């Protein structure tokens, strides 16, 4: 199995106007919101943003700007995350 490096810019440009989940490097913080824009430094602007800490909803934030060096990963949000439904843990 070999590793093939991929340029993240086309992936991120395809996600503009889609709901994404962004995990921060620090702690267990995640943001779910609509990706509005991404600049050449990969700073990220989200709208309709919701904050989750330890997978628990902590509040709606609205417009958010996330500096590039704080991001651990970005993924397309699934239906449960965008609808506001939160999975209950036992």
UniProtKB/Swiss-Prot annotation:
Stretches assigned to the Sm domain: 7-80
Keywords on record: Cytoplasm, mRNA processing, mRNA splicing, Nucleus, Ribonucleoprotein, RNA-binding, Spliceosome
Compartments in which it is found: Nucleus; Cytoplasm
Keyword Oxidoreductase: no
One BP term from GO: mRNA splicing, via spliceosome
Cross-referenced Pfam families: LSM
Primary site of residence: nucleus
A GO term for molecular function: RNA binding
Domain of life: Eukaryota
Entry's transmembrane regions: none
Recorded GO CC terms: catalytic step 2 spliceosome; pICln-Sm protein complex; post-mRNA release spliceosomal complex; Prp19 complex; U1 snRNP; U2 snRNP; U4 snRNP; U4/U6 x U5 tri-snRNP complex
Family classification: Belongs to the snRNP Sm proteins family. SmF/LSm6 subfamily.
Functional summary from the UniProt entry: Plays a role in pre-mRNA splicing as a core component of the spliceosomal U1, U2, U4 and U5 small nuclear ribonucleoproteins (snRNPs), the building blocks of the spliceosome.
Protein name (database record): Probable small nuclear ribonucleoprotein F
UniProt source species: Neurospora crassa (strain ATCC 24698 / 74-OR23-1A / CBS 708.71 / DSM 1257 / FGSC 987)
